[in-house]
Amino acid sequence: MPRLKTRREKRLRRHKRIRKKVFGTPERPRLCVYRSLNHFYAQIIDDTIGHTLVSASTLDPEFEKITGKRGGKSIKDAEVVAEIIARRALEKGIKKVVFDRGGFKYHGKIKAFADKCREMGLEF
């Protein structure tokens, strides 16, 4: 009898499938997102050398200055993280990225994050 798959297992399978196709280069690094139960994380990675170029999260001190709270799990908090990472990327001269949604469905916080990044000037 087949075992029921948990949400986490399904997400990890989607993530593996996406990672086979998505690869960050120096010209077009990978914008990777992770959504935990209480926080939202994003980083821009150059996969050729395996370095994180830019990162932001709801634990970032700049996030705390903007929102007045440490941590957050709402859609608005994901948009604030998008503003922070987009600004930092543009300061480093990164305009084009490949979006890696980390196996999460393109919905809710992930969609709001991506839309805000595009609005701030990042090209996917």
Curated annotation (Swiss-Prot):
**UniProt entry keywords in alphabetical sequence:** Ribonucleoprotein, Ribosomal protein, RNA-binding, rRNA-binding
**GO terms for MF:** 5S rRNA binding; structural constituent of ribosome
The reply on keyword rRNA-binding is yes
Q: List the disulfide bonds.
A: none
A Pfam family of the record is Ribosomal_L18p
GO terms for biological process, alphabetical = translation
Q: Which domain of life is it from?
A: Bacteria
Q: Name one GO cellular component term.
A: cytosolic large ribosomal subunit
Q: Quick check: keyword rRNA-binding in the entry?
A: yes
Q: Self-association or partners: how does it assemble?
A: Part of the 50S ribosomal subunit; part of the 5S rRNA/L5/L18/L25 subcomplex. Contacts the 5S and 23S rRNAs.
| Family according to the record | Belongs to the universal ribosomal protein uL18 family.
What task does this protein carry out? This is one of the proteins that bind and probably mediate the attachment of the 5S RNA into the large ribosomal subunit, where it forms part of the central protuberance.
**Name recorded for this polypeptide:** Large ribosomal subunit protein uL18
